[in-house]
A protein has these predicted regions:
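Short loop/turn segments that connect beta-strands within beta-propeller blades
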Residues: 33-35, 76-79, 123-125
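Short beta-strand elements that form the blades of beta-propeller/WD-repeat-like
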Residues: 10, 17-23, 57-64, 108-113, ...
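Short linear proline/tyrosine/threonine-rich motifs used for host-factor recruitment
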Residues: 20-21, 30, 83, 112, ...
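Structural motif
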Residues: 27-29, 67-73, 116-119
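Beta-propeller fold detector
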Residues: 39-44, 82-88, 129-136
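A short helix->beta-strand "capping" segment at the edge of beta-propeller domains
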Residues: 1-4
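Feature marking well-ordered beta-strand scaffolds used for ligand recognition
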Residues: 40, 60-64, 99-100, 132
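Repeated scaffold domains used in trafficking and secretory/extracellular systems
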Residues: 6-12, 44-54, 91-103, 136-158
Length: 158
C-alpha cells in the first residue's frame, strides 16, 4: 500500500494574525501564533473545507462541504477556544444552501439570510433560536461574514 504524508493546510488566520486554523487530515488545530502553541484540537468525521473568523477573533466557524456538509462553531472564552457544536440545520435544508444571501454577526447571534427565510443561531451555544419564513428576507445590520464564507465556495454557495 502507498502511504501519503499528512498534508497540513492553513484554513484561515484571524485578522490580527494571532490565531491560525490548520487542518491535518480530519483533525483541526487552532494555533496561537503569539505563544507558538496549539490552543485547541478536534477531530471531525469529515474534512473541513474552510474556516471563518469574525473581526474580533473570538468566533470561529469551520465549514465542511460535500456529503457531511455542516458549519461548526468555536468560541474563545475564559482564555481558551471551546467547541460549541454544529449549527443545527432545519429538516431537508442544510445551513449553507444556494438560496443563502447573507451571513451576519450581531448581538451574539449568527444570522443567515436566505431568499425567503431568516435563521438566527446563538453564538454561545450554536442553537437555532429563530427560524422564520419571510418574503423577500432582508437584513443588513451586523458584521458581514458573507464574503469570507464565499471564499470557501469560490463560485458562490453551491
Amino acid at each position: 500500500a502507498i502511504s501519503f504524508p499528512l498534508m497540513n493546510l492553513v484554513l484561515a488566520s484571524s485578522e490580527d494574525g494571532r490565531w491560525q486554523v490548520v487542518r491535518e487530515g480530519r483533525k483541526v488545530n487552532i494555533i496561537d501564533r503569539t505563544a507558538n502553541s496549539c490552543s485547541c484540537s478536534r477531530i471531525f468525521l469529515t474534512y473541513m473545507s474552510g474556516a471563518v473568523f469574525d473581526c474580533s477573533g473570538m468566533v470561529l466557524l469551520l465549514v465542511a462541504r460535500g456529503l457531511r456538509a455542516g458549519v461548526f462553531l468555536f468560541r474563545f472564552a475564559n482564555g481558551e477556544w471551546q467547541y460549541r457544536g454544529e449549527l443545527e440545520p432545519i429538516p431537508h435544508q442544510g445551513v449553507i444552501t444556494k438560496r443563502l444571501q447573507k451571513i451576519l454577526l450581531r448581538d451574539n447571534r449568527l444570522i443567515f439570510v436566505y431568499n425567503s427565510r431568516i435563521r438566527k443561531y446563538d453564538v454561545e451555544t450554536g442553537k437555532l433560536v429563530y427560524n422564520k419564513a419571510v418574503r423577500h428576507a432582508f437584513e443588513t445590520e451586523g458584521e458581514d461574514l458573507t464574503q469570507k464564507f464565499k471564499g470557501i465556495y469560490r463560485t458562490g454557495f453551491y
